[in-house]
């Protein structure tokens, strides 16, 4: 009788264990340190992906870290403090030189300008001669300044150039220490607003569209990609989801609110920057790849660097653009 009871108890316990749900193993998200610049163009995908849960769906937790420009972002990646970064057009020359790889297009921008003061006697590009002009080295705005000088048959020797960081450009321009400066959004619109209209855009990316395409991209170091190519593909997949949301004009106000929160600025300021680029969807990016236009755009960008003397010789765009990653992430 005791043996029978023991058998019955064993069977009962087995049945109970069979129906008790086993708690799912908790998988900790991969924490990524992601570099950005404080503007809409740099943040529209990152903040959308965070707030819509696209990155968490891919197993990531993003820690956003602010930088002033692309070259300093790449330097931070090289010292190991940043995993993934966003860069504007100017820093692409560092990718061409082998310091990083582009794993996804972000957008084609129009955020750079040479800003000038009317009080300094500037109304056209030739008026830059003899003027104090500020710029941030290695940025896309420096390229716009270079093109402006070329169009006016001027050289760097014809102006009084001052190399500064982004925040110094803004304050120096407003104080009158500079007569003109090469900068980018949101500083461009802020200079107009805070100067009471004295400061204006002398020229922008659009004025030089025949020579340069203002490509803005997501980048990673070669070594990081070799170790974590699957991680980068998943990250790109989340970017694509963010594109499909953020590229819809009806969602601009929501994205602008998220950008404003991250930058601690007014929503209206972020919303005013939605004209700084053409915001692509996932299909837009794929169409550019499949048609060969994206490769040609990056080549055009590279040729503009060669023409300006920023790089010495042309290299295949496939050396630094990870087209396969962009394609695979869309599957």
Show which residues each predicted segment covers.
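Short, low-complexity disordered leader/linker segments with a strong preference
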Residues: 1-31, 329-331
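Short, glycine-/small- and polar/acidic-enriched structural segments
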Residues: 25-165, 172, 179-185, 200-202, ...
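Predominant activation on well-ordered alpha-helical scaffold segments within soluble catalytic domains
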Residues: 47, 93, 146, 189-192, ...
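Short polybasic/polar patches that bind polyanions
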Residues: 56, 150, 193, 261, ...
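Secondary-structure end/capping motifs
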Residues: 226-310
């Amino acid at each position: 009788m005791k043996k029978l009871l023991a058998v019955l108890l064993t069977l009962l316990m087995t049945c109970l264990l069979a129906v008790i749900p086993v708690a799912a193993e908790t998988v900790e998200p991969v924490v990524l340190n992601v570099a950005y610049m404080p503007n809409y163009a740099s943040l529209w995908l990152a903040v959308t992906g965070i707030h819509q849960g696209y990155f968490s769906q891919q197993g990531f937790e993003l820690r956003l870290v602010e930088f002033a420009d692309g070259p300093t972002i790449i330097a931070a990646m090289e010292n190991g403090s940043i995993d993934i970064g966003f860069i504007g057009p100017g820093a692409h020359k560092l990718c061409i030189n082998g310091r990083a790889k582009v794993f996804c297009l972000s957008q084609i921008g129009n955020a750079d300008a040479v800003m000038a003061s009317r009080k300094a006697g500037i109304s056209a590009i030739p008026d830059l001669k003899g003027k104090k002009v500020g710029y941030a080295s290695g940025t896309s705005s420096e390229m716009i300044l270079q093109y402006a000088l070329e169009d006016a048959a001027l050289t760097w020797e014809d102006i009084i150039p001052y190399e500064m960081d982004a925040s110094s450009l803004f304050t120096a321009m407003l104080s009158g220490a500079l007569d003109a400066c090469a900068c980018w959004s949101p500083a461009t619109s802020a200079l107009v607003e805070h100067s009471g209209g004295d400061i204006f855009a002398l020229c922008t990316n659009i004025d030089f569209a025949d020579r340069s395409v203002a490509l803005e991209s997501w980048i990673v170091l070669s070594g990081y990609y070799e170790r974590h190519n699957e991680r980068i593909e998943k990250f790109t997949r989340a970017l694509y989801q963010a594109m499909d949301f953020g590229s819809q004009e009806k969602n601009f106000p929501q994205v602008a609110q998220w950008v404003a929160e991250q930058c601690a600025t007014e929503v209206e300021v972020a919303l005013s920057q939605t004209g700084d680029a053409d915001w692509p969807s996932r299909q837009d990016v794929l169409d550019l790849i499949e048609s060969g236009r994206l490769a040609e755009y990056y080549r055009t960008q590279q040729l503009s660097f060669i023409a300006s003397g920023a790089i010495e010789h042309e290299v295949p765009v496939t050396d630094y653009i990870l087209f396969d990653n962009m394609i695979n992430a869309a599957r």
